[in-house]
Amino acid sequence: MPRVVLNGVTVDFPFQPYPCQQEYMTKVLECLQKKVNGILESPTGTGKTLCLLCSTLAWQQHLRDAVSSLKIAERVQGELFASRTLSSWGSAAAASGDSIECYTDIPKIIYASRTHSQLTQVIRELRNTAYRPKVCVLGSREQLCIHPEVKKQESNHMQISLCRKKVASRSCHFYNNVEAKFLEQDLATPILDIEDLVKNGSKQKMCPYYLSRNMKQQADIIFMPYNYLLDAKSRKAHSIDLKGTVVIFDEAHNVEKICEESASFDLTPRDVASGLEIINQVLEEQARVTQQGELQQEFIVDTSSSGLNMELEDIAKLKMILLRLEEAIDAVQLPGDDRGVTKPGSYIFELFAEAQITFQTKGCILESLDQIIQHLAGRTGVFTNTAGLQKLMDIIQIVFSVDPPEGSPGSLVGLGISHSYKVHIHPETSHRRAAKRSDAWSTTASRKQGKVLSYWCFSPSQSMRELVCQGVRTLILTSGTLAPLSSFALEMQIPFPVCLENPHIIDKNQLWVGIVPRGPDGVQLSSAYDKRFSEECLSSLGKALSNIARVVPHGLLVFFPSYPVMEKSLEFWQVQGLARKVEALKPLFVEPRNKGSFSEVIDAYYQQVASPASNGATFLAVCRGKASEGLDFSDMNGRGVIVTGLPYPPRMDPRVVLKMQFLDEMRGRSGVGGQCLSGQEWYQQQASRAVNQAIGRVIRHRHDYGAIFLCDHRFAYADARAQLPSWVRPYLKVYDNFGHVIRDVAQFFRVAQKTMPLPVPQAVTSSVSEGEIALKDATLSSYSLSTRKAMSLDVHVPSLRQKPIGLPAAGDSESSLCGEYEQQTFSAQQRPMGLLAALEYNEQKAGASEEQALGSSTPSLRCEKRLSTEQKGGRKKVRLVNHPEEPMAGTQAGRAKMFMVAVKQALSQANFDTFTQALQHYKSSDDFEALVASLTCLFAEDPKKHTLLKGFYQFVRPHHKQQFEDICFQLTGQRCGYQPGKRELESKLTLSEGVDRQLDPGQHLNQGQPHLSAHPTSKGHTSHCTKVGCAVEKPGQPAVSDYLSDVHKALGSASCNQLTAALRAYKQDDDLDKVVAVVAALTTAKPEHLPLLQRFGMFVRRHHKPQFLQTCADLMGLPTTGKDLELEGPRDESPTVPPELTHEDLKPGPSMSKKPEKTQSKISSFFRQRPDESVRSDDTTPKPMQLPPRLPHELMKPHRSKQ
């Protein structure tokens, strides 16, 4: 590799660096050698990541060589080098004037970026260099943990708590193997990223999370996300020592926002209520254990400890603190216009002091909260959601992050913090509450609107100064969009002696930039608030897009100011037919809101652009979104970028308003207005930086070329043009006529395609791991499955999506219990005409059962098969071949392959590996119980994956099919199509028979035989009528969903939530009296609700059914003979349970080990244990729980907080 000497340091570079790259590396070395901070801006595509790595590692190697030479000189006591001066051993040591002792430990390099995907790209660049340092990548347990039990935890903090428990008790064998295998050569040598760590950890059976932490001690360069550095809690959790280190923030335009967000919080009524519910649950459990003396039996969870080591009085005090905090927030008077009130930052200490949360008590409170979270770690179910408690812990740590000096009051600290913080209290709106609802208590009826407590930091200097105070040697901030550098440095409030604003490395014929103020119809293009949704603007923008798509080759990127603007535009274009015109030119791909679907969509876009038969593709995204940050759209993937407007922050958002006020106050207080940003300047800068990030997608390397379209008339203003990158402004041109835009762009691309070298052919770029790239091999027609699904606009745009009839509303609590039941689709099959049609009809009929099971989970697969048939003229062609290379999509093997693709898309890589291992084990051992246990963990907990469990029916062997269908119905409420009384066919005479015989027998579970099918039945479920009421199940809908829907209609949302909560509790504790008490209280108030009590029998477990029958007879005044009263539900040997109840719950527990004695239960016994219920019987009154004498009685009442 070429070598270049810069500032006395020899740098190995993969190629001869360009002048701007040499200048960039010179500035980096200047920062390192002088031990000063630097802000370095270099346009995207100039190779700043490569320059950063090569220059810093070259300096580190140079320093290491210098120190080694000095140590050799000392060892020989100066005999060999007595005449040499210190400066001759290297400028790095001499220039700084440090003694030899300062370099005993070579400074570590900490390289931080926004996301792990960006860090993966950086590590990929590192592998292309000549340097081979010791590398460490830090990640979270969510990314690195491979322990099955820990991975199943729903939240990150629960994973942390359970992991710590297992590590402390030495019960995690993956952790135990780390120390033994850490020093093995194959792990210490290579450069590992996150995916490599997980692969090696799984292979070596050791924990990747703690492996990376051990590697950190010996690493030369450590990679981590921003928040690990900027958040004091994360620094402490990962034991990051910054003293003497070199810290590099890549993509540093996000640092300001991350600094402010890491020091801010929003406390909602839901968070307080969640914490109170958990504390109340623990309080009741501890009181019960204290009374019964059964502490050891009730609370041992995976450890040898005796349980929660807290007194009842301490738990009660903790509950009282949260109640007082809630009361203090509610006591704040708000104006009647829902705007909220703003107070200085020091007010947070006054508010918390009312709840007895102070500098003196914070330690005890944090310790108590941590004990409860650790105690509940590993439990499952909705009532162990400790997210609220974890958030309270984080809030207390943020507020009291700076301890006052000894002997001084905490009020002095509060006065100092008030300059950077504001407290904002505002009412919680119903739409926010519905949008964030994810747990049982969030839908509890509230008569009084709750209030949100916000504590916002408006100065990034708060976190940055704290970072520098840790002893950082050099801090380097770099990005492609930092200008203006002076204002950026002022916001950080730390010195940056070294600054650089680099030009680009491209020539004039590689970039075209045009401001397009009007569309083809002459209508002014604007994304201003009053015009963005007007039909004239939307229509003109759509016409402009369709015209630009005609002249821009290959990939075209379109960036909108926000998701609502993009979705509204797409909705309008769909109605007006404009989207269809663009689709005909370049298929549309839409950036999804959720992170999980993004990799699928972007990979499909890459594949579409790379297809030789296509004209490219159009990718619709949003500024500040995932596509605008760090993704590679080089060469054909991004020949054009359209920016449809200026993405200003929401002007009326309280946080934006307060930020602008804060900057104006700071500017007035400083007295030097020209040196500080005003609020309006910051507001404009936020929009321009987002635009500049989007623009940076088009030019990614020296020989790349592309066009930039700024489609908003406000880009023509002088202040907006001045905010554009310096390397873009020389190419800028304002067009008054849209026709001239098309003319010039067409000419630009004609010249560029003739003069610029052809891009080097590369593999299809992917944003996911290598294991997930295998999905692209499952192409079923001219486009892959992922491409088909990604091109479905209604999948990613909610406004275009039709809501299925009969599904519960998104906010209903029963939806979380039932899951999402997809409706069955029935299509009338036409009578086959002709021989070919008859053959195709027979094949489709033979595989109807498996295809139905698969099709309900992946609608895109049905579309795929239909489109494939349409492209072939609506009739399947039959070709006789001897050795087909891969199965056809219509065969059994083809459907199996489609199912595996769907499973791999739905599961993570680790879970998919578990799935394949379960398949292999079932094939070799025929162990059906082990198979069901594995499938239950993978598919039963998430309602969205229920149809995948149903689709697995095609792989089940004949003698297990009926048993599998019963289990599937119990877990999901869906049947697989098994027909009792009909023998499963052992072979099929279909067109795919020859194909199946050629397949590798290892792909089949039935000893190499074809997959067996079962024909679906359309008769539906048998209904059971009784004297009380009769319920007829609707075809294709589970009985559970019908019942909960009827409860919701009859009793209301609050009562339905109460019933589902009791049902979940019954699932866990098997306490029939408790659940019947709730159901009876809800359904016996009115005679017309009594059938709901009788129908509840579908949930009652088998050993409880006689007792439940007797109870129903007593409550409804019916005869007590079992012949006269029957329970509704399936008449099988297994109890009917809601879909969320897993297969493990069907196994006998401690309370189910033997059949209970038959007792005569009265309604009074049900209410005796429910002091919080208001329903009373004629012959009894509720009795409160017996408490220890010293415990306040009112604290044992269940808290009904505002939600």
From Swiss-Prot:
UniProt cross-references to SUPFAM superfamilies, sorted A to Z: P-loop containing nucleoside triphosphate hydrolases
Compartments where located: Nucleus
Top-level lineage group: Eukaryota
Binding-site positions, ATP: 42-49
Keyword DNA repair: yes
Positions that bind [4Fe-4S] cluster: 145, 163, 172, 207
GO biological process: DNA repair; DNA strand displacement; mitotic telomere maintenance via semi-conservative replication; negative regulation of DNA recombination; negative regulation of t-circle formation; negative regulation of telomere maintenance in response to DNA damage; positive regulation of telomere capping; positive regulation of telomere maintenance
A cellular component term, taken from the record's GO annotations: chromosome, telomeric region
Tissue specificity: Widely expressed. Expressed in spleen, thymus, Peyer patches, kidney, and intestine. Not expressed in brain, heart, lung, skeletal muscles, skin and white fat. In the adult gonad, it is highly expressed in the testis, mainly in the spermatogonia and meiotic spermatocytes.
Pfam families tied to this protein: ARCH_RTEL1, DEAD_2, Helicase_C_2, HHD_RTEL1
Basic and acidic residues: bias regions: 1123-1134, 1169-1181
Any one Gene Ontology molecular-function term assigned to this protein's record: helicase activity
Enzyme Commission number(s): 5.6.2.-
Catalytic reaction list: ATP + H2O = ADP + phosphate + H(+)
Location, primary (coarse class): nucleus
Segments forming domain Helicase ATP-binding: 7-296
Motif PIP-box per record, residues: 1160-1167
Mutagenesis / variant outcome for changing residue 1166 to A: Abolishes interaction with PCNA
Keywords, alphabetical: 4Fe-4S, ATP-binding, DNA damage, DNA repair, DNA-binding, Helicase, Hydrolase, Iron, Iron-sulfur, Isomerase, Metal-binding, Nucleotide-binding, Nucleus
Phenotype upon loss of function: Death between days 10 and 11.5 of gestation with defects in the nervous system, heart, vasculature and extraembryonic tissues. Effects are due to severe genome instability and stochastic telomere loss in embryonic stem cells which display many chromosome breaks and fusions upon differentiation in vitro.
Motif Nuclear localization signal positions after renumbering to this chain: 151-167, 871-877
Complex and partners: Interacts with TERF1. Interacts (via PIP-box) with PCNA; the interaction is direct and essential for suppressing telomere fragility. Interacts with MMS19; the interaction mediates the association of RTEL1 with the cytosolic iron-sulfur protein assembly (CIA) complex.
Entry similarity comment: Belongs to the helicase family. RAD3/XPD subfamily.
Function: A probable ATP-dependent DNA helicase implicated in telomere-length regulation, DNA repair and the maintenance of genomic stability. Acts as an anti-recombinase to counteract toxic recombination and limit crossover during meiosis. Regulates meiotic recombination and crossover homeostasis by physically dissociating strand invasion events and thereby promotes noncrossover repair by meiotic synthesis dependent strand annealing (SDSA) as well as disassembly of D loop recombination intermediates.
The protein's name in its UniProt record: Regulator of telomere elongation helicase 1
Primary gene name: Rtel1
